[in-house]
Amino acid sequence: MAFITINHHAPADNGAAFVAENATLAGSVRLEKNSSVWYGAVLRADTGRIAIGENSNVQDNAVLHTGPGLDVTVGSGTSVGHGAVVHGCTVGDGCLIGMHATILNGAVIGDGCLIAAGALVPENMQVPAGSLVIGVPGKVVRPVSAAQAAAIKANEEEYLELARAHAEAK
C-alpha cells in the first residue's frame, strides 16, 4: 500500500481491517475502525480531507478525490462499489454506492441510500435518506425497499469478513 504525505498531511489508519497492498492513500485520509480499502483503489486528499467511517469499504478501483475546499466524507457501514468515483461530496451511513457510479462535488447522500450502478449524482444534489437513485443524471425514483436495505447491510457484513480474510492472508 502506498501511504503518501502531501503538504505535511499523511494518511491515518485508526484501526482499518484491511488496506490492499496496491491501494493508494495520499494526503489527509483517515480510515476508521474495521474500514477497508481494496485493490487498486485511490483515495487522494491533496486539496481537502477524506474520512472513511467505521465498517465501511472502498472497493477495487474506486477513486475518492477532494476538490478545492471540498472534503469527502463516507459514513459508517457504507460500501463504495468497484470503480465508483466519489468526488468532493458527503455520503451518509449505511449506503451502497453501486459499481461505476459517480458522485460529484457538493452532493450530499443521506443515510441508507442506494445509488445504482452507473448512476451519475450531479453536483450539489441533495439525496434524502433512504432513497434509491438511478440514471444519468441520477434521479430519486423511490424509497429503498426492505429487501434492498437488507442487501446493503449484508454487503457491509460480507466486506467485514472478506477484509479479515485478506488481512490474514498477507
Language model segments and positions:
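A short, polar/charged loop-to-alpha-helix boundary motif
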Residues: 50
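Left-handed beta-helix
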Residues: 15, 20-21, 26-27, 32-33, ...
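C-terminal segments of enzyme domains that contribute to small-molecule binding surfaces
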Residues: 2-14, 70-72, 76-85, 93, ...
